[in-house]
């Protein structure tokens, strides 16, 4: 019995030691990572995208000298022509959603109607004398009126010409 008790005691002690070793290992690794963070101050800087880094390194804009590229949206005053051109070229590479497709169709329809309205010129109207206007008005009014068709007379003696309808 004493031997069994010693084995149990040693096994629990070994398990406790192993658990303590694991905990100390975890503590050491966390301390190491904390030291690395303290030594490397760049990790504390806010994260920037590659595009914004390129913008900061590129030469200044031609219109406002804001030190960002013309395609960047971080500055509203940058060259709108180049931004518009850029958005049209990159449109090919993205997948268009249903909503986007509907808005594109609306925009195309609007542009077509505007171009058609520009093409259609109003016809010049000739000045008519008052007598010509009245003649044109009455001729147009009479053209719409049609003569009533002749209706055959109805015989009162036979209300139902068909015998089948009268019997039912």
UniProtKB/Swiss-Prot annotation:
Cellular compartment(s): Cytoplasm, Cytoskeleton, Perinuclear theca
Record bears the keyword Cytoplasm: yes
Signal peptide start-end: none
Chief location bin: cytoplasm
Domain of life of the organism encoding this protein: Eukaryota
Keywords: Cytoplasm, Cytoskeleton
Chain segments carrying region Disordered: 144-168
GO CC terms of this entry: acrosomal vesicle; perinuclear theca
Tissue and organ expression note: Specifically expressed in spermatozoa (at protein level). Detected from the elongated spermatid stage onwards; not found in immature germ cells or somatic cells (at protein level).
Entry protein name: Cysteine-rich perinuclear theca protein 1
Gene from which the chain derives: Cypt1
């Amino acid at each position: 019995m004493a031997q069994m008790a010693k084995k149990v005691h040693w096994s629990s002690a070994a398990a406790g030691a192993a658990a303590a070793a694991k905990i100390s290992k975890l503590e050491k690794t966390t301390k190491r990572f904390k030291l690395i963070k303290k030594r490397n101050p760049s990790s504390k800087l806010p994260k920037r995208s590659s595009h914004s880094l390129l913008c900061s390194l590129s030469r200044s804009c031609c219109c406002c000298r804001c030190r960002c590229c013309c395609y960047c949206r971080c500055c509203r005053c940058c060259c709108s022509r180049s931004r518009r051109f850029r958005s049209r070229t990159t449109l090919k590479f993205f997948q268009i959603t249903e909503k986007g497709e509907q808005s594109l169709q609306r925009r195309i329809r609007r542009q077509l109607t505007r171009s058609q309205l520009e093409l259609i010129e109003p016809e010049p109207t000739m000045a008519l004398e008052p007598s010509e206007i009245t003649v044109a008005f009455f001729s147009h009014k009479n053209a719409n009126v049609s003569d009533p068709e002749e209706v055959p007379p109805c015989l009162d003696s036979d209300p139902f010409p068909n015998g089948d309808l009268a019997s039912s």
